[in-house]
Amino acid sequence: MSTVLGSSRQAVDVSPFTRLPDLALRTYGGAVVAASDESFAEREALIRPGRPEFRPHTFGPKGQVYDGWETRRRRGPGHDWAIVRLGLPGIIRGVIVDTAWFKGNYPPYASVEACAAEGHPSVDELSGWVEIVAKSPLSGDAVHEFPVADPRRFTHVRLNIFPDGGVARLRVHGEVVPDRTFLDGLTVDLAALENGARVVSCSDEFYSSPNNVIAPGLARHQAEGWETARRRGGGNDWLIVALAGPGMVAVAELDTANLIYNAPGAASLSGIDARRASLDDAGAWFPLLPRTRLQPDTRHRFRLDDVRTVTHVRLDIYPDGGLARLRLLGALTRTSDPITFD
């Protein structure tokens, strides 16, 4: 069953899955590897970050310019489709089909399939497709949210539209499930989203999501980091990251890139082994990095001396502000299992 939110420009999230990362996002490594047609607007737009834009009366050689994927009018049987390789393979919890700005040229129906592939297959080698969103009606210029109940790990999705038309964005929200072959026995970023880490709570996300601090790559601007509202009272802002698995953190990197006038004055890190104590037990947390001064627009690196195993790390910033990236380099313990989320 889908949820239709109306105009894409209303910026309202209803379904809980929308708080999970978009596994298909281009900035996370996603790619639209094939499409049946892209005569009016290119397929790559489906997974662009940000909300779709529109400038009326802007015409190119193919007609009105759209920020989305648009196919030609079908005169025969069949339907159009696009295949997306997920940048972050994982368990899909929900899909969004956004027809923003497509009013007289949106597809009346859509469905979504998914498959899991090992290695680096070509499009022709993809097989074992299963339906995760049944053929469902769409409206024009609207956000359609479809919860997904399949618990399997997927690497690719296929958007089917019936029979043709335009879709602005495809969002595939879920939980990252990495290939453990590339984690065990190696020094890795235990806080990386692509390795299965996840932000489980934070004090404030007024300007941008805390998930950004564990995203791949460098933040290109402030909006690609985490930024809180200005504090007018006491206290400080914080977030908690569930690591890729139980491990020992050797190096911490706190990056305030692009935050020139709104970087925190200082930060600290604490750790806990949540297999032995509750996250709510303040006495079970132990310091990894004492309160340390930060500089604006700077990548700070710190060696950590505490070699105890941790499953979660708490970042405190004083008193507020933002952070572009948090990296925690270390190794999983040999008996590590991925941390599960309730």
Residue map of PLM features:
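Beta-strand cores of modular interaction/reader domains in eukaryotic scaffold and signaling proteins
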Residues: 83-85, 96, 111-113, 158-160, ...
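Intrinsic, low-complexity N-terminal interaction/targeting segments
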Residues: 59-67, 121-146, 212-231, 278-304
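A short beta-strand element within beta-rich, extracytoplasmic domains
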Residues: 90-101, 159, 248-258, 315
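Exposed beta-strand and adjacent loop surfaces of beta-rich binding modules
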Residues: 107-109, 167, 249-251, 264-266, ...
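Short, surface-exposed beta-strand/strand-loop-strand elements in extracellular ectodomains
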Residues: 105-118, 262-275
